[in-house]
Amino acid sequence: MIGAIILAAGSSRRFGGDKRKAELADGITVLTQTIHAAAKLLHSVLVVLRFGDRNYEKELQQQINLPNVSYFLSPDSAKGMAHSLSNAIYHHSDLDAAMIFLADMPFVQEATIKALLNAYAANEDAQPIVLPTVNGTPGHPVIFDKVYFNEIQELEGDRGARPVVDAHQEKLVRIEVEDDGVIRDIDTPRDL
């Protein structure tokens, strides 16, 4: 089974507030949009929050009442994205593969998620890392086969899983998409 892990434990320093709660044009929040996009196509969605986000977790549970969505408060969230991802992979190690979403990238299209899932299924025996690209520029979400979970759990700092991707270029399956959502993140209120 492929599950989603949504990394939502960052500090939003550049945004000037909690960008996860910022509203998009349609009134839905950034994180809620990302959760719905993942939950629509994946059987299991784990949302990784900051360690002190217990109240926000309860708020999300009330807003997003979906049986395939669960939440995890990363004990190492203050140490950076790699630590939160490592904690999440450990917590969700029963998966065959994990599709890693970034909470601040709510514009990824459903067709893109389907294309990535199809590419993983077509290459599953090769234990791929499936990565979307727009005009050759790599983006998110990225699917990692379970064979990479141990390496992901050893990551440190704030670079995410980039070192794992860099170490396994021969395993990369790049899917060119016409979806700027895979490279468009929200760093400032102007990005909404």
Question: Which residues fall in each region the model found?
Answer:
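SAM-dependent methyltransferases
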Residues: 1-3, 65, 122-125, 189-192
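Conserved N-terminal catalytic core of the sugar/cofactor nucleotidyltransferase
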Residues: 31-97, 110-111
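Conserved beta-strand segments of alpha/beta enzyme cores
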Residues: 20, 68-70, 128, 171-173
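Residues at secondary-structure transition points
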Residues: 15-25, 29, 51, 72-83, ...
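Active-site glycine-centered loops adjacent to acidic/histidine catalytic or metal-binding residues
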Residues: 10, 104, 188
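Conserved alpha/beta core of the MobA/IspD/sugar-nucleotide pyrophosphorylase nucleotidyltransferase superfamily
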Residues: 1, 150, 154-192
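N-terminal glycine-rich phosphate-binding loop and ensuing alpha1 helix
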Residues: 1-54
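Conserved beta-loop-beta/alpha segment of the NTase-like Rossmann-fold superfamily
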Residues: 78-146, 150
